[in-house]
């Protein structure tokens, strides 16, 4: 589905976007709310507040990357108190392959698994899958790829990635996107965007 057909060109809130795109009544989506708090009079800069089940996020914000749902070399307490982190990013591709969804699910989701009690965003893993150019095949149904860990075969589809992110228990989930190289021709980049927006 193209963006224009979904929203008719109007600007939507983060809540509306997630509620529509994922077509779910997931608790984290129902309770998510974005409030625009400040707009700069002379530029497009703005500040806001995103409410999630795991706490508020002031925007703009520094978001540390904990690829496997853990920050290396720093305790969560210090991450919050010293670095003032309000949200961390975890990667769906890496969590899917190791430790795997069975372990994440048995732990009660990524927050319990990692002991991070604040908001968490999951990247779809699209960049990682598409960077495996020798180990992946893009088809209409999704992307077939081989694990960089053990060579096992997998298929990521937009639906399977969202299901995986739901199992992870992220507060904010990124859609599975094709990530063309920075020097990709315009036509290829436009085709990639259309594929992501469907």
Task: Give the residues covered by each predicted segment.
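Non-catalytic, usually N-terminal nucleic-acid engagement modules in DNA/RNA processing proteins
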Residues: 31-198
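Short hydrophobic alpha-helical segments enriched in small aliphatic residues
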Residues: 8, 16-23
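Short, basic/low-complexity N-terminal boundary segments at the transition from targeting/disordered tails
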Residues: 14, 22, 29-35
